[in-house]
Amino acid sequence: MSKIPTRIVRESSDSELPITVRIGKSGVIDSVIDEIKDQLSSRSLVKIKLNRGVASGSSERMEIFSTLATKTSSVVSFSRGNIVVLWSGK
């Protein structure tokens, strides 16, 4: 996929964009992946929050974010701390 449009980056970093998926202590399971795919089919941006304790450090968080993007055929358009926004590319 090519470069992410500026408009998408701006929308992704907006704090008003609501968190629509939370990943808890069970981690990235199939039902979470399916929910993200469903949301990406109806909207272009999905904001996800990892609850405390899911990832121990920033490298583990980035690995989880990368895995989510790969499994949902999307792109990480924004990440900060335990928050990631995935873009469907549409």
Residue map of PLM features:
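Positively charged, polar, low-complexity stretches
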Residues: M1-K90
